[in-house]
Design a protein with these regions (language model features):
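Post-transcriptional modification and biogenesis factors for structured RNAs
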Residues: 1-199
Length: 199
């Protein structure tokens, strides 16, 4: 919110000084069907921005779907990577169109902090399956890995309909992922660790 304008109305992703969550709705209930009667009656302690307080899950997803960006995010999960939940949460924060998990179907949802409920998630058994989906959807695969020859992300000209493909902690993107990608971008790092949490 613009602190220089005391009359400014906060946007959907701006926070107030209030505690996390709100109590039961005070006064007459709104009649709009996007509101959830249980939340109106009992209060809403979910980790959602204030604009979505008391809304049903389906109403929130429908509203997000009107505004999602064109890019997709994918992460390989051949070794049961523990970072996938964080990737899902970050994809939600940046309003990615979809998240794709490649490899094992099971993943650790803890890091997602229930944002997986608001994010479209698709599973692919192999990188080849992901590449086939990308071709059909008109998406350009861009691998993200700190490898020789990669283009620094801050200098790259990414296609609007990009599918950002992250590898796993440790091995990075697989050879199959490198071959499926049109380009590989790196994320600049200045500390001692070789990799960062993809989320």
């Amino acid at each position: 919110m613009d602190s220089s304008n005391p009359n400014a109305v906060p946007g959907p992703t701006e926070w107030t000084e209030a505690r996390h969550g709100v109590g039961p709705w005070e006064g007459e209930w709104p009649s709009n069907p996007r509101y959830d009667e249980t939340l109106l009656r009992e209060g809403d302690t979910r980790n959602v921005v204030d604009a979505y307080r008391y809304w049903s899950l389906d109403a929130i997803v429908a509203d997000l779907d009107k505004r999602r960006h064109d890019f997709h995010v994918a992460i390989e999960n051949f070794e049961h990577d523990m970072n996938i939940g964080t990737v899902v949460r970050t994809a939600n924060a940046f309003l990615a169109k979809e998240v794709h998990i490649v490899g094992k179907k099971r993943w650790n949802r803890r890091g997602a902090m229930v944002t997986d409920r608001y994010q479209h998630i698709r599973h692919h058994k192999t990188v080849a399956d992901l590449a086939e989906f990308a071709r059909g959807a008109g998406l350009t695969i861009v691998a993200i890995d700190n490898t020789p020859g990669s283009v620094p992300l801050e200098a790259a000209k990414l296609p609007k309909r990009a599918l950002l493909l992250f590898g796993q902690e440790g091995p990075g993107v697989t050879d199959d992922a490198q071959r499926a990608a049109t380009m590989t971008c790196s994320i600049a790092q200045f500390g001692s660790t070789r990799s960062i949490n993809a989320g």
